[in-house]
Amino acid sequence: MKARLPDSPLDWLVSKFAREVPGVAHALLVSVDGLPVAASEHLPRERADQLAAVTSGLASLAGGAAQLFDGGQVLQSVVEMQNGYLLLMQVGDGSALAALAATGCDIGQIGYEMAILVERVGGVVQSCRR
């Protein structure tokens, strides 16, 4: 049995996203300090921790590049891998939403669905930090 993250009030939203958006295998909401906040239901704790670290690092690098080259705020990042995609989208408070998706997916549709989810969780994440 693989350990899971402790239940978060946002787990059901992130799980619903991963379950209902075609091509998405896993999704994770990562705090501004790189810790997993909410994870899709089939993402083991160890993998959630690893994905959180990767997400935090990539978000930081993308933000640094945007700042260095006057690119404004990073809206999303896409990493295309041989066997799938890693999509990142920033939540208003500096947190990030990560999604792992299959190669044959519609990344435009996933990006759209991520934007909707980010809108839904953004206020909740910000109020939890207060």
Swiss-Prot record:
GO function terms (MF aspect): serine-type endopeptidase inhibitor activity
Record-linked InterPro entries: Mycobact_SerProt_Inhib_Rv3364c, Roadblock/LAMTOR2_dom
Keyword set, alphabetical order: Host cytoplasm, Protease inhibitor, Secreted, Serine protease inhibitor, Virulence
Main localization, broad class: secreted
Regions crossing the membrane: none
Subcellular location(s) per record: Secreted; Host cytoplasm
GO cellular component, one term: extracellular region
SMART domains: Robl_LC7
Record's keyword annotation contains Secreted: yes
UniProt keyword Magnesium present: no
Conditions for induction: Component of the signal transduction operon Rv3361c-Rv3365c that is highly up-regulated during M.tuberculosis infection of macrophages.
PANTHER family tied to this protein: SERINE PROTEASE INHIBITOR RV3364C
Family stated for the protein in its record: Belongs to the mycobacterial serine protease inhibitor Rv3364c family.
Annotated function: Effector protein that binds to the host serine protease cathepsin G on the macrophage cell membrane, inhibiting its enzymatic activity and the downstream activation of caspase-1-dependent apoptosis. Thus prevents macrophage pyroptosis and helps M.tuberculosis survival within host cells.
Quaternary structure note: Interacts with human cathepsin G protein.
Name assigned to this protein: Serine protease inhibitor Rv3364c
Species, as recorded: Mycobacterium tuberculosis (strain ATCC 25618 / H37Rv)
